[in-house]
Structure formats: structure tokens, C-alpha cells
Amino acid sequence: MRLLILILLSVLVLFQYNFWFGSNGFLDYRQNAEKIKENQAENEKLSQRNQRINAEIQGLTKGFEAIEERARMQHGLVKENEVFYHIVKESK
């Protein structure tokens, strides 16, 4: 009888070890779950960035105002009979 109990206890310990530390065990599961959360957050950020870029592309392809605004801001272009003032803050 003692031998049977010892064998069953050994099997239980083996199963517990595999559950906690074995491949695809609980610790692997927790690590993978954390990686999945990180990847989902990164995917959400990239999806939002893609939406902003897509909206900008749509604005540039369909709207002259967006092209004009971009030319004014990035390249300092002005219209005819228009004066451009660039105010620079003094550095202390």
C-alpha cells in the first residue's frame, strides 16, 4: 500500500512540475498572454497611425486646401500680394 501511495505521489509531483515549468505550462502561458497584450497595444497604435496617414493622403489627393496648407507650413510659400511674418522667440 505504501508503494502505491509513493507512486501516486511521484506521479502527482511530475504532473505538477510539468504544469508549472514544462513546455506550454502555466508560466509559458502567462508570458505569452503578456506578449499578446503588448502586441495588441502596438497594433492599435499602428492602426491609429495608419488611419491618420490615410486621412492625410485622402485630403492631399482630393483637396486643394490641404496641399496649399502643407506648402505654406512646410515650405513658407505665400500667395501673390501676401506678406509672411515669421516670429522667432528669443532664447534666454
UniProtKB/Swiss-Prot annotation:
Residues 1-3 are cytoplasmic. Keywords: Cell cycle, Cell division, Cell inner membrane, Cell membrane, Coiled coil, Membrane, Transmembrane, Transmembrane helix. Residues 22-92 are periplasmic. It is found in: Cell inner membrane. The chain crosses the membrane at residues 4-21. One of its GO terms (cellular component) is cell division site. Pfam families: DivIC (PF04977). One of its GO terms (biological process) is FtsZ-dependent cytokinesis. Its main location: membrane. Residues 28-63 form a coiled coil. It is a single-pass type II membrane protein. NCBIfam families: PRK00888.1. Essential cell division protein. May link together the upstream cell division proteins, which are predominantly cytoplasmic, with the downstream cell division proteins, which are predominantly periplasmic. Belongs to the FtsB family. Part of a complex composed of FtsB, FtsL and FtsQ. PANTHER family: CELL DIVISION PROTEIN FTSB. This is Cell division protein FtsB. It comes from Haemophilus influenzae (strain ATCC 51907 / DSM 11121 / KW20 / Rd). The lineage of its organism: Bacteria, Pseudomonadati, Pseudomonadota, Gammaproteobacteria, Pasteurellales.
